[in-house]
UniProtKB/Swiss-Prot annotation:
This is Ribonuclease Z. Its EC number is 3.1.26.11. Belongs to the RNase Z family. It is an enzyme of class 3 (hydrolase). Homodimer. Zinc phosphodiesterase, which displays some tRNA 3'-processing endonuclease activity. Probably involved in tRNA maturation, by removing a 3'-trailer from precursor tRNA. It comes from Mycobacterium bovis (strain ATCC BAA-935 / AF2122/97).
Length: 280
C-alpha cells in the first residue's frame, strides 16, 4: 500500500488556506516529498513527518512555486538530524537541480556557518546528494522503486514526472504539464495519478494576459482526466488548483473530470489523504 498526502494544493498565488504545491508519498518506512512549495514543512509536521525523516526529495521542475521551501527543507533536515553520521539527503530532479541546490546552500551560507560555529556536533554543511534525470530508473531501495519520464511544461524544460511503486501498488506524480505521450506511458496502468489542474474556462476570462498565459503549459481538469483515462489508471487525484477551489465547489471540479474519466476521482484540501492499493 502507498499513501498519498496532498501537503500543498495551492499555486504561485499565496492562499491563506493552501500551501504551495507539494505531495507526500509514504511507502512503508520510506517517505518521499514531491516538490517543495511554500509551507510544506508545516503541513508535513501535521501528519507526523519531519524533514529529517524524509527518504528523498523529488522535484518535478524548477519553477519557484515548486521549490520555494527547498532551502528550509535542506537546512531543517540537517539541524534536526541527530545521528552521529547522517546519510546525505537525496534530491532527485531534472537537469539544473544541482545548480539550484548549490545556489540555495550558498544563500544560506551565513546560517550554515553560524550553526557550525555554535554546535560542536555540526562540523560540516548539510549532507546532500543530487541526482539529475530526464528518464529511466531513479530509485531502488528496500522494495521501493521510482522511475522518471519527461513531461511537457514548455517553455519550462526539462520537466519530469515520477512513478513510485511498492508492494504491487503504483502512483504517478505528473507535476505541471500538458498532455503528452511520455506521461501516458509513465502512468500506464498505475493505481493512482496525481495531476495538477487548472480551470481554463475561468482563467481565460481573466483580463491580464500574464494570467491567461498559464493555459499554455498546464492541463485543464478535463485534460488531466483524459490522461488518466488513456493511461487506464485507477484513481485520479487532482491538486494545484487554479483558481483555488472555493467552499462547496469541489463537486464542480469532480463533475468536469468525470466527463473524461469514469474511475475514482479525488479532490481535496491540504492534508487530504488517499490510500493506494494494488488493483486485483
Amino acid at each position: 500500500m502507498l499513501e498519498i498526502t496532498l501537503l500543498g494544493t495551492g499555486s504561485p498565488i499565496p492562499d491563506p488556506d493552501r500551501a504551495g504545491p507539494s505531495t507526500l508519498v509514504r511507502a512503508g518506512a520510506q517517505a518521499f516529498l514531491v516538490d517543495c512549495g511554500r509551507g510544506v514543512l508545516q503541513r508535513a509536521a501535521a501528519v507526523g513527518v519531519g524533514a529529517a525523516g524524509l527518504s528523498a526529495v523529488l522535484l518535478t521542475h524548477l519553477h519557484s512555486d515548486h521549490i520555494a521551501e527547498l532551502g528550509d527543507v535542506l537546512i531543517t533536515s540537517w539541524v534536526t538530524n541527530f545521528a552521529a553520521d547522517p546519510a546525505p539527503l537525496p534530491i532527485i530532479g531534472p537537469p539544473g537541480t544541482a545548480e539550484v541546490v548549490e545556489a540555495t546552500l550558498k544563500a544560506f551560507g551565513h546560517d550554515i556557518g553560524y550553526r557550525i560555529a555554535h554546535h560542536a556536533d555540526l562540523t560540516t554543511p548539510p549532507p546532500i546528494e543530487v541526482h539529475e534525470y530526464t528518464a529511466g530508473p531513479a530509485w531502488d531501495r528496500d522494495g521501493v522503486t521510482i522511475r522518471v519520464a519527461p513531461t511537457d511544461h514548455r517553455p519550462v524544460t526539462p520537466t519530469i514526472g515520477f512513478r513510485i511503486e511498492s508492494d504491487g501498488a503504483s502512483v504517478v506524480l505528473a507535476g505541471d504539464t500538458v498532455p503528452c505521450d511520455s506521461l501516458d506511458q509513465l502512468a500506464a496502468g498505475a493505481d493512482a495519478l496525481v495531476h495538477t489542474v487548472i480551470r481554463k474556462d475561468i482563467v481565460t476570462q481573466i483580463p491580464q494576459q500574464r494570467v491567461k498565459d498559464i493555459c499554455d503549459y498546464h492541463s485543464s481538469v478535463q485534460e488531466a482526466a483524459a490522461t488518466a483515462n488513456r493511461a487506464g489508471v485507477g484513481t485520479l487525484v487532482m491538486t494545484h488548483y487554479v483558481p483555488a477551489i472555493g467552499p462547496g465547489q469541489e463537486e464542480q471540479w469532480r463533475a468536469l473530470a468525470a466527463t473524461e474519466f469514469s474511475g475514482r476521482i479525488e479532490v481535496g484540501n491540504d492534508l487530504h489523504r488517499v490510500e493506494v492499493h494494488p488493483r486485483r
